[in-house]
Amino acid sequence: MIMNKALPLHRIAMILGLLLIGLSAVANSYGQAVKVIVDTDMLTDPEDVNALWLLNTLADRGEAEILACVVNGHETNRASGAAVDVVNTWFGRPNIPLGAFKGGYPKKRSPFTPLLRDRFPHSASDDDKLPSALDIYRGVLAKQPDKSVVIVSIGFLVNLKDVLFSAPDKHSSLAGVDLIRRKVKKLAVMGGKYPQGVEYNFSFGGVGKCTYEVLQQWPAEVPIVFSGYEIGGRVISGKSYKQKLPQGPLRMALEHQYNALARGRESWDELTVLYAVRGLSCQGVEYWKLHCGGCVSIDAKTGSDVWQNAPNKNQSYLVELLPPDRLAKVLEGLILTGPKKK
C-alpha cells in the first residue's frame, strides 16, 4: 500500500530551489549566453587586449553576449576606445556600444593603442569624442531584464563610481544605485591582493578614494567577486603565441609592451573575464573556489586592501584550485581559436 504524505512547505521550497539551480546550470552549459558589460583601462598593458580577445572568443562560442564596452582612465593618446573597437571589429562586432571615462585621471601613455587605432579597421572616435561611459552604462542597463547583467571590471572603478552616484536621466527614472540593484546580477572585479596587500587597479594615480567609495556604497544585494593579484600573477599565458598567433591586433599589442609576445604575460584580466562568463568551473573542471563571509576594507589614501571577516557584504574572492599551467592552457586554447568566420 502506497501512502501519500504531504511534504512540509520548507522542504518543498528547498527542493524547488535546488531544481531551479540545476536547470540554470544546464541552461548555461547549453548556450544561455552571459550578458556582459566590460569596463577596461586599455592603457599600458596588452593583457587588456588579451582579455577582450578572450571575451569575443567566448561570445563566438555562444557563452557570452557583449552588451557594451567602456574604458576607464585617461590614455594620453586618446586611443583606448579605438583599440577596443579594433578588437570588436576584428571579431565582426563593430556596433557594440562604446563609451569612455570623462574624468581625466589616472593618466598614462600607451605604446600600443595608437598603433592598433592607425593600422586596423574600426569606426571609433578618439576618447574625447566618444559617448561618456556613464551614458552607455545607464542606457544599456535600463534596457536589460532585471538581475541579468554581469559587469566585468578590469581596470579602475572610476566609471562604476559615476554610475553608482548617478541621478535619474532620460534612460531610467532610477538613481544609479537602484539601477545597479535592479539590473546587475554580479560584479566581477580584477583588483586587490588577498588576504591583504596593495594592487595597481585599486591604488594607481590617486584612485584609492574612488575604490573606497565604490566598495563602501555598492548595494549588498549585488554580489562582488574579486580576482586578486595573486590569482592572475601566477598564470603566465601566451608562451606559444610567438609561434602560433597569427598577425593581427593582439599580436601587435603583445609585440610592443613588456616583451609579452616572447615571454607570455600574467593573466589578471583574462581570468577575471573567464570567471565572469564561466563561473567557478566548466564541464566538470574546477578552476577556483570562493572565500566568502566578510568584505574588503580599503585605505582611501593608498588604495591598499585588507580582507575582514565581518561585516558580511556579499563579497568574496577567488582561491586557486586548478594549477596555473593548466589554467594557462585553458586561456591559450581559447585565444588561439581566433575569430569565428562570419
Regions found by a protein language model. Give the residues of each.
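N-terminal secretory signal peptides that target proteins for export/translocation
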Residues: 1-9
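A general, composition-driven signal for non-globular sequence regions
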Residues: 4-5, 22, 29
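Short stretches within intrinsically disordered, low-complexity N-terminal or propeptide regions
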Residues: 8, 15, 27-29
